[in-house]
Amino acid sequence: MYKRQVLAILAIVSGLVNAQAADNYTVSRTEYDQPDFQGVWNFSSNTPLERPERFGDREYLTPEEAIAIRTATLAATEAGLDADNGVGTYNTFWFEMAGRGDNIRTSLVTYPANGRLPPPVESAVAVGSRAGIDVSGSRPVRFMVGGIGMDGPEDRGLSERCIVGFNAGPPFLPSAYNNNVQIFQSRDNFVIMTEMVHDARIVPLDHSTHIDDDIRLWSGDSRGYWDEDTLVVETRNFNDMTQSFGTFAAPQLGTAYDKFLTERFTRTDEFTINYEFTIEDPSTFTDKITVQLPMAKVDGLLYEYACHEGNYGLLNTLRGARQEEQDAVDL
């Protein structure tokens, strides 16, 4: 186990050499002479979303810093193997947090320049807590994990209800697992099928206009076009029942109703897509947000993510709450 961890650390540094070699890469193309993005891709990352304040405006770690941080992370994980803790979670064997070795940025956020999310506007409402802990609030529940109670399914987070995956967006944001996506292409459509929750986003490339502004969708309405060898996808018409932006480690804020999302997909070598997105949401943030994230080619298949396999997990959550209420009455 330790030997594998050391090799993973060394891969961080060796990845820099591979990145330089990619300068000579010629983009493979489909039969329609479009850049070929087809296949299964993984967007895991061990880079934090926001830059730790100690790095200031520095975009990149030195190789020595990258090794030191990774070593400290592994040491903390090994030191935390406490047999007294509960077992209702996953261990590091199941977590997908390695990411591309050549991504040694200090943060996934590249704008603002400090690598941190811009301040929210005064009227932006925090719609959820960090780490999926239940909070007080009212319906609709716009965040992904956790909830505001257990009176009914509408009190639970969107990913608990198998409506929207907590990492699939759009946009993609790496989480602890299931950071996979499969891309299909035809001449006039670009199809993005996320592992969680097994949802396919069909992006027309035919220069058609967006749907009417009154029609609102969970994943918004996407339209794409080519900027040389980069695919640009613009998405709007999100509904007001999802958060504007947020992760397990960052506050979950606002609604997505006024959000405008621009994604850019660029092949940088045979095994990598540079994925970049910009969020503009004046109802939630005082400035735009840009994130850059490498996606790694996966030599394998994407299998169905069945969520609650019939959603009995949600049913049992509510059933357990009713039993606890009955037990309290019987005391």
Indicate where each model-derived feature is located.
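Bacterial N-terminal signal peptides
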Residues: 6-15
